[in-house]
Design a protein with these regions (language model features):
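Intrinsically disordered, low-complexity regulatory regions in eukaryotic proteins
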Residues: 1-72, 76-137
Length: 137
């Protein structure tokens, strides 16, 4: 019973770490999606602030507002129009959000199982103490 409780605690910890990574990724994707949403108003020659991660922005001059470079997976980037990039990022963000929900559900399930198992262990201990006639806590 104790080994199973330890396993649940370990799994909860792993899921919590995974949730942190997914939440960070979702935030990055949301920021990129928001940026691309406002990019349609930009004209050639405009100075803009470009988010580069970690809360850092750099100043840049737009040379072609019809093209952006976006990740298409596996560390490969491709040139595309801002709308297509926003759509890809939105789809990735939605998949990450689904994964976040699944991980949260996994955490909740393990926490519920852990709580139930802990209550069973406490009840068994109390029953054992009562059978021995020892004082209970």
């Amino acid at each position: 019973m104790i080994a199973l409780l330890d396993r649940y605690r370990y799994e909860i910890e792993m899921f919590t770490q995974q949730l942190g990574l997914l939440t960070s990724t979702e935030s990055e994707l949301a920021a990129a999606w928001d940026f691309l949403g406002s990019f349609g108003e930009v004209k050639e020659g405009d100075d803009i602030l470009v988010p580069v991660g970690g809360g850092v922005l750099i100043s840049a001059t737009v040379t072609d507002p019809e093209k952006v470079i976006a990740s298409i997976g596996m560390d490969i980037q491709a040139e595309m129009d801002p709308e297509a990039a926003a759509e890809r990022i939105g789809e990735r963000r939605d998949r990450i959000r689904e994964m976040i929900q699944q991980v949260r559900a996994g955490i909740e399930q393990r926490e519920a199982s852990s709580t139930a198992l802990q209550q069973q262990a406490e009840a068994a201990y109390m029953e054992l103490q009562n059978a021995r006639g020892a004082p209970t806590i």
